Amino acid sequence: MAQAPEYHYVGSVDYQPTRPSAHQNLIELYGLTELAKKVGRVDEFGNKRKMRRSYKAYIQDLPGYNEILRDNTIKQWLTNPIREEVPIDIEFLHHVFSVEPGIIPGFNPKVFGLEDDVVMGNVSRDSSQPRSPSRRKK
C-alpha cells in the first residue's frame, strides 16, 4: 500500500521582528548606562553600595508628578470596614432574579452562532409560550 505524500505549508508572508528586541541591552540602547552606574546597588567591582533612599534627584527634570504619596485607603478599608445595615426588600429580589418565558430583551442570535433568518423581535404573541429559534421567516 502506497503512503500518502506529506505536504507542508510554506508561508509567503514575511514578518519583521519587533524593535527593540528583548535580546538587546536596552540600558545601553537608550543611553542609560551612566544612570544605572550611579543608582546601582552593586558597583563595577562587585562591591555592594549603600542603598539610596531616594531617586528623586534623578527624576526631577522629568515632566509630571514625581512624588509618590503613601495612601493607606485600601488598607483601612480592609482592616476597619464600615458596616452598616442595608435594608433588603425580598419582593424586589424575587422580581429582579426571576426568569420568565419569552424573548430576552436585546438578544442577538448571531452571538451564539444561530442562523440569521431566525425570527426574533417584537412580534405580538402569547408571552407564556417561549419562541423557538427554529421558527423561520416565511
From Swiss-Prot:
Single GO MF descriptor: transcription coactivator activity
Function, as annotated: Component of the Mediator complex, a coactivator involved in the regulated transcription of nearly all RNA polymerase II-dependent genes. Mediator functions as a bridge to convey information from gene-specific regulatory proteins to the basal RNA polymerase II transcription machinery. Mediator is recruited to promoters by direct interactions with regulatory proteins and serves as a scaffold for the assembly of a functional preinitiation complex with RNA polymerase II and the general transcription factors.
Entry protein name: Mediator of RNA polymerase II transcription subunit 19
Main location: nucleus
Subunit structure: Component of the Mediator complex.
Pfam families listed in its UniProt record: Rox3
CC annotations in GO: core mediator complex; mediator complex; nucleus
UniProt record similarity statement: Belongs to the Mediator complex subunit 19 family.
Keywords, comma-separated and alphabetical: Activator, Nucleus, Transcription, Transcription regulation
Subcellular location: Nucleus
